[in-house]
Amino acid sequence: MRCPYCQHPDSDVIDTRKLHNGETIRRRRKCEACGRRFTTYERVEMVSITVVKKNGEREPYDREKLMRGVRTACYRRPVPAQALEALANDIEAELMARDEPEVPSSLIGDMVMRRLRAIDDVAYIRFASVYRSFADIGKLREAVDELLGQGH
């Protein structure tokens, strides 16, 4: 692996760890030339999935876009970063298992909502308020009442 500091083409692996139930490998490396250390992450490349938006536009699936939405919903909530990574990994595994080149954005939104609901009620309501585009406080109240009515 090329050193990000001096661009030397070779480095030694000094530590390897599995993360996220073995779905990601973290490697600590040391450059053979300059001796500086750096970290690399290795994960299986997803099959190309196209997301079909509500307006019919198509765009490539973007894990970072998913993570930004989930992080925003969980802002200042007691949700560990590992839980968010696991949520994204679960969604990606489910998308890959479907073995379909195109998926509607609504399917991904539903997957996120189902998982957020199990993680944190406030994050779920925050995400739902944007995802479902609540037009008024009444719709938001219905979502909260539904959540409370189901024993959360």
Swiss-Prot record:
Cofactor note: Binds 1 zinc ion.
Residues of the ATP-cone domain: 49-139
GO biological process, one term: negative regulation of DNA-templated transcription
Molecular function as annotated in GO: ATP binding; DNA binding; zinc ion binding
Zinc finger extent (unnamed): 3-34
Tagged with keyword Transcription regulation: yes
The keyword Methyltransferase belongs to this UniProt entry's keyword annotation: no
UniProt cofactor(s): Zn(2+)
Keywords linked to the UniProt accession: ATP-binding, DNA-binding, Metal-binding, Nucleotide-binding, Repressor, Transcription, Transcription regulation, Zinc, Zinc-finger
Pfam families: ATP-cone (PF03477), Zn_ribbon_NrdR (PF22811)
Similarity annotation: Belongs to the NrdR family.
Function: Negatively regulates transcription of bacterial ribonucleotide reductase nrd genes and operons by binding to NrdR-boxes.
The protein's name in its UniProt record: Transcriptional repressor NrdR
Name of the coding gene: nrdR
